[in-house]
Curated annotation (Swiss-Prot):
Designated name of the protein: Adenylate kinase
Span list, region NMP: 70-99
Pfam family, one: ADK
Positions contributing to AMP binding: T71, R76, G97, L98, V99, G126, F127, P128, R129, Q133, R201, R212
Entry comment, domain topic: Consists of three domains, a large central CORE domain and two small peripheral domains, NMPbind and LID, which undergo movements during catalysis. The LID domain closes over the site of phosphoryl transfer upon ATP binding. Assembling and dissambling the active center during each catalytic cycle provides an effective means to prevent ATP hydrolysis.
Self-association and partners: Monomer.
Lineage: Eukaryota, Fungi, Dikarya, Ascomycota, Pezizomycotina
Function, in words: Catalyzes the reversible transfer of the terminal phosphate group between ATP and AMP. Plays an important role in cellular energy homeostasis and in adenine nucleotide metabolism. Adenylate kinase activity is critical for regulation of the phosphate utilization and the AMP de novo biosynthesis pathways.
Binding site residues for ATP: G50, A51, G52, K53, G54, T55, R168, S177, Y178, Q240
């Protein structure tokens, strides 16, 4: 009888131990590997200036509790903090040169390693702009046992972009963007969230925009083709209302890319009504 009780006690201890391990794994699903949770997002947002990246990225960030990595903001932040990469980048920029791909990849990696927000994933905005950059990004992520899930392209006609950008308003601190016609703030020239003043960028004029668009199209076509071949490229009609574009993004995240790419023309009606 005593031997039977001992066996039952040992069996109970084993079951308790297994139960504890199961609970621990449920609490930490990524233990023992680099795989992500179901809610983690890893994506790049492709689109010309004025396509709506600054409108949609904060919504994605809020939904997934992830970080929004805009290369320009990253560079300015690293330079301001005088990090080793920031000092190296500043030296190059002061000499009128272009910051190397290795430095930008290094900055992205540092953000992924140290930015708490990046634990929920990331949105890359403004990078990669070339196929070699895309390949370097893939290699860096592969070394972390990660890979991109989505390369979303916000597609829009150049003529509509001119109308959009010449009325664009920006909140400098957050990057939130508005438009006098398409997406006006609740109070004129005032950020909805902070109440701080909005600005209009000096390069948001038709002539400057045409040059930026020419550069964008020549650079981006090969990158889009690269991600199309990998199977993660998804197009969205960015001429639609911001709310409709957001629904298209949600469809992509839910796996319905066909529905996400459907056309809509609500924004064109606003354009005509505004007399632009």
């Amino acid at each position: 009888m005593g031997a039977m009780e001992d066996q039952l006690q040992r069996l109970g201890s084993v079951l308790d131990s297994l139960d504890a391990r199961v609970k621990k794994l449920e609490q930490h699903p990524t233990l023992g590997g680099g795989s992500s949770t179901a809610q983690e997002i890893r994506m790049i947002l492709i689109g010309p200036p004025g396509a709506g990246k600054g409108t949609q990225a904060p919504k994605i960030k809020e939904k997934f509790s992830c970080c929004h990595l805009a290369t320009g903001d990253m560079l300015r932040s690293q330079v301001a903090k005088k990090t080793p990469l920031g000092r190296e980048a500043k030296k190059i920029m002061d000499q009128g040169g272009l910051v190397s791909d290795d430095i930008v990849i290094g900055m992205i990696k540092e953000e992924l390693d140290t930015n708490v927000e990046c634990k929920g994933g990331f949105i890359l905005d403004g990078f990669p702009r070339t196929v070699p950059q895309a390949q370097s990004l893939d290699a860096m992520l592969q070394a972390r046992n990660q890979k991109l899930q989505h390369a979303v392209e916000l597609q829009i006609d150049d003529a509509l972009l001119v109308a959009r950008i010449t009325g664009r308003l920006v909140h400098p601190a957050s990057g939130r963007s508005y438009h006098t016609t398409f997406n006006p703030p609740k109070k004129a020239m005032t950020d909805d969230v902070t109440g701080e003043p909005l600005i209009q960028r000096s390069d948001d004029n038709a002539d400057a925009l045409k040059k930026r668009l020419a550069t964008y199209h020549s650079q981006t076509a090969p990158v889009v083709d690269y991600y199309r071949k990998t199977g993660i490229w998804k197009p969205i009609d960015a001429s639609q209302e911001p709310g409709t574009v957001w629904k298209s993004l949600l469809n992509i995240f839910d796996g319905d890319a066909k529905k996400a790419s459907s056309a809509g023309g609500g924004i064109l009606d606003k354009l005509a009504a505004s007399g632009r």
